[in-house]
């Protein structure tokens, strides 16, 4: 692992532990055992570090269009991968709106990615319809399901925090229940 990669890893761990607001580049340098100047040789500021962590997270979750889930089983398998990555970068979901407000470059990148992600969720839903796992004939219903799934994935961590629930590696997995509930009324009935 290169020094640059090690700095990102230490920063991610620190952000997850105490949050980005409590983690200056000086804190990251201290946790790395390097001087602040050495850290700044690699990264201009904390926002650049957060932005690069976001880009790394995005790379870990993105599937090529032709590999998007085509059935409920593979969708659930993919959701488990997404949960693991979301837990790994949990600081981002907990502080998303604040992070986007502090860094317009990150905000622009996230909005662009979020629009693309919404299209990808819609493609997954279309795959499930084509493969007769879901029956959705109304475009408005399809948009509602796509948005419900997107909202669940993006804001579940924040939601837990606002109701006093502890977020841990187990509770974060409950987001799958919300995505499943959004699709449940449209599941094709299977004959026994």
Locate predicted features.
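Hydrophobic alpha-helical connector segments
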Residues: 65-91, 146
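Short, well-structured alpha-helical segments
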Residues: 76, 80, 139-150, 154
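Amphipathic alpha-helical segments used for helix-helix packing
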Residues: 87-108, 123, 158
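Hydrophobic alpha-helical bundle segments that form small-molecule/ligand-binding pockets
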Residues: 117-146, 163-164
């Amino acid at each position: 692992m290169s020094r640059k990669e090690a700095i990102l890893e230490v920063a991610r761990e620190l952000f997850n532990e105490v949050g980005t607001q409590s983690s200056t580049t000086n804190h990251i340098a201290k946790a790395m055992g390097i001087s602040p100047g050495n850290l700044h040789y690699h990264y201009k500021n904390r926002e650049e570090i957060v932005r690069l962590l976001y880009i790394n997270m995005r790379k870990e979750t993105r599937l090529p269009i032709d590999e998007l889930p085509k059935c409920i089983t593979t969708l659930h398998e993919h959701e488990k991968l997404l949960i693991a990555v979301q837990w790994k970068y949990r600081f981002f979901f907990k502080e998303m709106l604040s992070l986007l407000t502090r860094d317009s470059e990150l905000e622009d990148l996230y909005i662009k990615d979020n629009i693309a992600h919404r299209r990808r969720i819609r493609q997954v839903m279309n795959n499930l319809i084509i493969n007769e796992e879901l029956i959705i004939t109304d475009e408005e219903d399809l948009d509602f399901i796509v948005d419900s799934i997107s909202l669940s994935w993006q804001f579940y961590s924040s939601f837990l925090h606002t109701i006093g629930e502890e977020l841990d590696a187990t509770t974060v997995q409950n987001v799958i229940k919300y995505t499943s509930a959004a699709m449940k009324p449209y599941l094709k009935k299977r004959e026994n």
